[in-house]
């Protein structure tokens, strides 16, 4: 597979055309991290890796956006992400990063919920 073109789409999102037929939309960070540019040859494994990274980034950013408005328990956030992204593996990896960075903490969530009562 060959990347035919990479064009700015909206904001920090780029439209990447593969083999002049398939379009995917990637964040500028993914473009830079995976050296995505016109003329690059990709095998199926490399494309899957890029798409996985893009989906992971989207899901993680979505979770951070949701956490701006209120706290979520692990189960609530996992189910919210699963409803949108449909991949248990992806949602599990996002939850692992959220908990390791301290954004999701069931103990803290329970303590705050108890204080509200």
What feature does the model see in each segment?
Residues 1-117:
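An alpha-helical, amphipathic repeat domain used for nucleic-acid recognition
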